[in-house]
Swiss-Prot record:
Basic and acidic residues biased stretches: 25-34, 419-431
Result for mutant: residue 63 to A: In cycB3XA; prevents its destruction after completion of anaphase
A biological process from GO: cell division
Entry's free-text remark on domains: The N-terminal destruction box (D-box) probably acts as a recognition signal for degradation via the ubiquitin-proteasome pathway.
Principal localisation: nucleus
Motif D-box, residue range(s) on this chain: 60-68
SUPFAM superfamilies reported for this sequence: Cyclin-like
Entry GO MF terms: cyclin-dependent protein serine/threonine kinase regulator activity
One GO cellular component term: cyclin-dependent protein kinase holoenzyme complex
Protein name: G2/mitotic-specific cyclin-B3
Length: 1395
């Protein structure tokens, strides 16, 4: 058995001459199917109908390809022997063709056509019996009109198996089985193919032309070579056809019946049934495609490309070995094809590529093929081919590697696939960096599969195919990270409805360049700048940092600053700011893990600075807890750093700044001066003073001696007490950390003075802490120290405390000692006092004196009362009432004076932090004074204070940590407080308790950690607000404390989202809303921030009531920090918008449009979303553009080819109306791929404005959504989710008739349900004006829309909101239908109860 020789680059000339002789001379003019295709076809096939003829031509061409390949390989002697035999066979064929044609015509009338394949001569030596048995191959295929076939090709180019009839499949399978029956038989068949090709000159010519792609025929040898290439490319398909042809030839020669052939074929089928059936289907589909286009050669070019594409990888893997065993491998490939349809195709391509000359010629031909169609078409075709490879056999796992080269059209398809494969990941990078490359490199398989159809489109572009491709293109974006850039391609292809896909090319480039390049390229500098910013932040001045922090907090407020959820709405730089805001918040939460994604923002530098600061804060917060020593030192040393960290450690910075203030504090009082001098010495360690005081107490082994000294001091003079008290007031006011700690400790003393044992207990704890000396230990173990002091020491301390109760001087000492201790004990006991005031404490308080009892009551009152201001006032009054004395009065007055007249230095230095400290310190001072009065202060007080001062001179890190922890918990522990006691929170009492808890501090470490978290998530602007407001409050002492405390407390409550989530029921209007408000107050001035800052001030403090109880919330607008928001007229503006939207209600206009459908509109909107992202426009621009399109289409008829022009022009008008810097007309011409002229755009603009009568100030859903968000204080993520839901409706035509205000309300309502924030629903109902029952039907529809959004082919909005910049809200699963129904039913029931 002779094996086939390796393919030769050239074939003997005699073959072609002989084959040309075989072809009969009577051919119909319809035989020429291609533009340049001058092939000769056997008469039997010519007699068929044009469609069947083309199908026959396809099959024959495929068979001939195989024969061509086989011709060059058999040994020369056989070729010559076959030539004679071929002549005889050809004569027989010519004789029988007419009769056969008539019979076939009759069958065509029944829509059945039998394809007579040109006889294939098999070598007599191998399969003699086959040749002798006559068989008329009747490949029955349902003849379809070219139109239907075109549609099928466009829609299901790959589903070729469905079309061929059973006979077709069986025949082909039989032919294949003949080939595969045995290796030697296959060889013989291949050898037969040579004479077959020699016989049919027309076949050779036909094959040559598809390979040459309409180029002039080269020499016959070259043509034969190309045929071999095509043969290898179409190995499976052609082999099947070859076998069929061979069998048909033998049948015709022997004139046997079909049955005999079937029997033999059945015997042959044993191996390759499935293998060949698949290629058979493909062949039939190919035939149909050829019939559709009438350009067989042109059509075959794409198949070649497909094979080359598929084979690119395989060719790389096995470049040479298969050249020699090409024919053998063909059979093997067919056999393997059964297992791997895809592999067979790939191997074919491999074989093609493996023949070097074949690869070269193939590449050249493919290039020529590309050159002929426009480059745009070429791009489409390669993609289509890959799609075919991918979808037909699912073998196109190759990725559109070849597509890139195909698009270039001048580079070999085979050579670049490697590079493409090598860097699939880089394609994403290049995708963002080089949109043009993206266009060329549609890496996603979906794109490839979609583009497969365009091959037909290139030949006969129709409107349907562009749409199909557009849909397919939408799928491609799934893989790539920067979907928006890829989607431009999708949009453009979708707009291919105009009949040309090419116009989509530039929009892609434009969008990708503007959108992803900027996003991806800039991230690196962004990160670098973050680092530099972190370094620079420390050097920046405190004040400058504070404002930045304010802005940053405003921008960052993710959950707390619910109103910053509209960063995208910033009209100045909406997209950049949006991304920046969202990124910063995300980066804070994620700790910059998503920096790569954050890089999408072009202008995140400022935000990143802020974010970096926050990161540093967060990082420092953790060490602060763990190792507060270094952190605190650094903070005290570098107030600027404190302010940088002020977001996370605002209290800490305040305490430090207070220290600085204390250093610069006025010397109004000698005692305060001394304190200041002490502070100046230990400015960095103000907290350590208290600790040192404790240390001194501890060091003075004889605490009794200190007590004696206190007694002696008491004996010395009461005047000293007065002066001391006055100084204490001033000191407390000025001592930011000391006063705070003293106050807190004294508060604890008030609660602990009753149980002095605890006081001494704390002292020993302090001693333990002091012995430890390390701040970390202090921070981590203060609780442990409190919990683990030895029992003996506790007993002795308790006894001493009893003695102290008997001797007030001792009490004073204990009080003084405790302040330091209290800083630690303060954390635990205050909670215990608030939560579980021990009876022991009560008894103790009662026993020592009425003052202690009053003091205890005051502490309780503080917890119960709404604000520290009232608490302080109450304390003052109670203290004065209990023990009216000039000393007390003077003390309070002095404290008030100090508060009223803080030194200018203090004001300037600590305007913001001072306010906090002043308010807290003043309260503490008042409280301490009250305590002292209650305790009957004596000179012992003076001594006790003086001693702490001495201690302050040698501060320790412990005090610093204590002060910082104390201050920080006061400001930031509120979320925990609210969570700990949700029921106790009332409109005011909640705030008061929060403050008292903040002072007394629950577990400080936990609070600090939570505060850090909250700061990282969204540094509370409420704190900043509290800083700013206290200044004005300080000027008016009476109101100062009230307003300051309110503002201060409100931020505490609202800064952390935990409060609301943990205690929604207990949250009253004031506390909940106020907190939300404070978060948003210091927002940027952009519109989105303006509306998001809707939570600037708490709503009027009504009881927890339902919306019915809520009076119109003027507070929402009256204190807006954004002057552009026009808070004075916010209500009137909102009412006007609702009235005006009635004038722009849309009706069902699509029925009046002749050429445009709702699907086309959806494609256009999807494209406009991409344009908005690419140009970085605001959301308002997008919404308005869509609204303009709808209004225009409602009043005028638009043609399909002008739809994109309409969309681009409407977007241009909207940009002029909404944007500060709108794109130029040329930019819009460019994104349309220059399909329209500048004059056309301007003309369309005039037309739109005339139709709309220039009335384009149209209320949109986004405006209402902003307003609702401002009113109900949603957090950033919830607001972004509602925006996503609302934007999804833009593509859906059936939402066009909904009112914008109602659509916005329903979107926000669904977002609240999804985020489990149902307790805000009554507020939404109140402010929107829509009842919940009105919104429920729309909510159901929106939930369905979200449920199936991931399955929608138009994914521009989905990908946009899947980005981390938008919190990836698109990935939040929609509510289950049953669960949603339960929620809606509960709401309805609740509403019924309220009514």
């Amino acid at each position: 058995m002779l094996l086939p020789l390796p393919p030769q680059s050239s074939k003997p000339v005699p073959k072609k001459s002989q084959s040309s002789k075989i072809v009969p001379s009577h051919h119909d003019p319809s035989e020429k199917t291609g533009e340049n295709c001058q092939t000769k076809i056997s008469p039997s096939s010519l007699q068929e109908s044009p469609s069947s003829l083309q199908g026959a031509l396809k099959k024959r061409s495929a068979f001939e390809d195989l024969t061509n390949a086989s011709q060059c390989q058999p040994v020369q002697p056989k070729k010559e022997a076959n030539k004679e035999f071929v002549k005889v066979v050809s004569k027989k064929i010519n004789r029988n063709t007419h009769a056969l044609g008539l019979a076939k015509k009759n069958k065509r009338n029944l829509k059945w056509h039998k394809l007579e394949v040109t006889p294939v001569v098999a070598s007599t030596t191998v399969v003699p019996n086959i040749m002798e048995k006559p068989l008329i191959l009747d490949i029955s295929t349902t003849s379809k009109t070219p139109n239907t076939e075109e549609a099928s090709l466009f829609r299901k180019p790959l589903v070729l198996k469905e079309e061929p009839t059973i006979e077709d499949e069986t025949l082909i399978n039989k032919s294949l089985s003949l080939k595969k029956c045995s290796n030697h038989e296959e060889v013989s068949l291949l050898e037969k193919l040579q004479p077959l090709q020699e016989e049919s000159d027309s076949d050779d010519a036909f094959v040559i032309e598809p390979m040459t792609f309409k180029k002039t025929h080269k020499t016959e040898e070259a043509a034969i070579t190309k045929k071999t290439l095509s043969l290898k490319k179409k190995m499976c398909a052609s082999q099947r056809k070859q076998s069929c042809q061979e069998e048909s030839l033998a049948v015709q020669d022997v004139n046997m019946e079909e049955d005999s052939f079937f029997m033999e074929s059945m015997s042959f089928k044993k191996k390759p049934k499935t293998e060949e059936s698949i290629p058979t289907h493909k062949l039939s589909s190919l035939k149909k495609k050829c019939t559709i286009y009438g350009k067989i050669c042109h059509f075959r070019k794409p198949p070649v490309l497909q094979t080359t594409i598929c084979g690119a990888m395989s060719s790389i893997k096995k470049p040479t070995t298969e050249k020699e065993t090409l024919f053998q491998e063909l059979s093997v490939l067919q056999e393997k094809h059964t297992t791997e349809h895809e592999m067979s195709i790939l191997k074919k391509s491999l074989a093609l590529q493996k023949t070097n000359f074949k690869e070269d010629s193939l590449v050249k031909e493919s290039l020529a093929f590309k050159k002929k169609p426009s480059t745009e078409e070429a791009i489409m075709m390669p993609v289509i081919l890959k799609e075919q490879c991918m979808t037909e056999g699912k073998r196109s796992r190759l990725k559109p590697l070849v597509l890139q080269e195909i698009t270039s059209g001048e580079k070999s398809l085979i050579m670049k696939p490697l590079s493409i494969k090598e860097k699939p990941s880089t394609e994403k990078e290049s995708f963002s960096q080089e949109p043009s490359a993206l266009q060329k490199k549609h890496t996603t398989q979906e794109e490839v599969s979609i583009l497969k159809e365009p091959s037909s489109l290139l030949k006969s572009p129709t409107e349907e195919s562009p749409f199909d491709e557009a849909l397919a293109f939408t799928k491609k974006c799934t893989i790539e990270e920067a979907p928006p850039t890829k989607k431009p391609l999708i949009l453009k292809r979708k707009h291919a409805t105009q009949g040309t896909m090419s116009h989509l090319k530039k929009p892609l480039i434009l969008q990708t360049t503007s959108g992803e390049k900027s996003l991806i390229k800039e991230p690196l500098p962004f990160k670098e700048e973050k680092v530099s910013l972190k370094k620079k932040c420390t050097t920046q001045e405190m004040m400058s940092i504070c404002p930045e922090l304010l802005d940053f907090q405003d921008m960052i407020g993710e959950d707390k600053n619910s109103f910053f959820m509209e960063p995208m709405s910033f009209r100045k730089n909406p997209t950049t700011e949006e991304t920046v805001l969202t990124k910063t918040s995300l980066s804070l939460q994620e700790k910059k893990i998503t920096q790569g994604k954050m890089s999408h923002l072009k202008k995140p530098l400022v935000l990143q600075k802020i974010t970096s600061e926050e990161e540093s804060f967060y990082k420092k917060l953790l060490p602060f807890k763990m190792k507060s020593t270094t952190e605190e030192k650094f903070l005290s040393q570098e107030p600027s750093a404190l302010k940088e960290k002020h977001t996370t450690l605002q209290e800490v910075s305040l305490s430090k700044e207070s220290l600085a203030i204390q250093e610069k504090a006025t010397t109004e009082e000698e005692f305060s001066q001394e304190l200041f001098s002490l502070h100046v010495k230990h400015t960095n360690k103000s907290g350590s003073l208290f600790q040192e005081a404790l240390v001194l107490q501890e060091k003075t082994d004889a605490e009794e001696d200190s007590l004696k000294n206190l007694l002696a001091l008491q004996e010395k003079s009461t005047m000293e007490e007065e002066s001391l008290i006055n100084k204490l007031l001033a000191l407390k006011e000025e001592l930011s950390a000391e006063a705070a700690t003293n106050i807190q400790t004294q508060l604890s003393l008030k609660k602990k003075s009753t149980s002095h044992g605890k006081v001494f207990f704390l002292k020993k704890q302090l001693a333990l802490n002091e012995t430890i000396n390390e701040e970390e230990f202090l921070n981590k173990q203060p609780l442990a120290l409190e919990g683990y002091p030895s029992i003996a020491e506790g007993e002795t301390l308790f006894k001493k405390l009893l003695a102290m109760q008997e001797e007030p001087s001792i009490e004073k000492e204990a009080v003084l000692k405790e302040p330091t201790i209290d800083t630690e004990a303060h954390f635990k006991e205050p909670l215990a006092l608030q939560e579980e005031p021990s009876t022991e404490k009560e008894a103790v308080l009662k026993e020592p004196s009425v003052d202690t009892e009053a003091h205890f009551k005051e502490t309780l009152a503080l917890q119960e009362k709404p604000s520290i201001e009232q608490e302080a006032l109450f304390k003052r009054h109670s203290a004065l009432w209990e023990k009216p004395s000039t000393e007390k009065e003077t003390i309070f007055k002095e404290s008030l004076d100090l508060q009223e007249k803080p030194s200018i230095k203090k004001e300037t230095l600590l305007k913001k932090p001072l306010a906090l400290k002043m308010s807290t310190i003043n309260e503490a001072v008042l409280f301490e004074d009250m305590i002292a009065l209650n305790e009957k202060p004596t000179t012992g007080k003076e001594l006790s204070f003086k001693e702490p001062l001495a201690l302050q001179e040698s501060p320790t890190y412990k005090e610093d940590t204590f002060l910082k922890t104390l201050l920080v918990p006061q400001v930031g522990t509120s979320p925990n407080v609210s969570s700990t006691a949700p029921e106790s929170i009332t409109s005011k009492s909640s705030i008061a308790t929060m403050t008292s808890v903040g002072k007394s501090g629950t577990i400080n470490e936990a609070f600090l950690f939570e505060d850090m978290i909250t700061l990282n998530e969204k540094p509370t602007t409420g704190k900043e607000l509290s800083f700013k407001e206290p200044l004005a409050l300080q000027e008016s002492p009476t109101c100062k404390e009230d307003t300051f405390l309110e503002t201060f407390l409100i931020p505490q409550i609202g800064t952390s989202p935990y409060v609301f989530s943990t205690t929604p029921e207990s949250i009253t209007e004031k506390s909940s809303i106020a907190t939300m408000t404070s978060v948003g107050k210091s927002r940027t001035t952009t519109e989105s921030s303006a509306c998001e800052s809707a939570s600037d001030k708490p709503v009027s403090p009504q009881a927890k009531g339902t919306p019915k109880e809520i009076t119109p919330r003027e507070d929402i607008d009256e204190d807006s920090s954004d002057p552009s928001f026009n808070p004075m007229y916010a209500k009137e503006i909102f009412s006007y918008m609702k009235e005006r939207e009635e004038q722009f209600i849309l009706t069902d206009y699509m029925n009046r449009q002749i050429e445009i459908t709702s699907d086309m509109r959806a494609i256009l909107v999807d494209w406009l979303v991409e344009v908005q992202v690419s140009f970085e426009m605001t959301h308002e621009t997008l919404y308005l553009a869509v609204k303009l399109v709808d209004l225009y289409l409602m009043k005028a008829v638009c043609k399909k080819d002008k739809l994109q022009l309409l969309g681009a022009t409407a977007f241009m008008i909207a940009a002029k109306f909404e944007e500060h810097n709108s794109p130029r007309v040329d930019d819009f011409v460019y994104i349309c791929d220059d399909n329209y002229q500048r004059s056309e755009v301007l003309s369309m603009e005039i037309n739109i404005l005339n139709v709309l009568k220039c009335d384009i100030n149209i209320p949109i859903a986004y405006h209402f959504l902003r307003r609702y968000a401002r009113c109900i204080h949603t957090n950033m993520k919830t607001l972004t989710l509602s925006r996503y839901i609302c934007e999804m409706t833009l593509q859906e035509y059936h939402y066009v008739q909904e009112k914008a205000s109602k659509l916005a309300a329903a979107s926000l309502l669904l977002a609240l349900y999804m985020k489990k924030l149902g307790y805000w629903v009554p507020f939404l109902e109140h402010y929107s004006g829509y009842s919940i029952s009105e919104l429920h039907p729309l909510v159901r529809q929106l939930n369905k829309l979200l449920t199936f959004s991931s399955y929608d082919s138009l994914k521009a909005v989905y990908y946009k909101y899947s980005h981390p910049v938008f919190f990836e809200v698109a990935k939040i699963p929609a509510l289950d239908m049953l669960k949603l129904e339960e929620i809606l039913n509960c709401d309805c029931e609740a509403q019924g109860l309220v009514l």
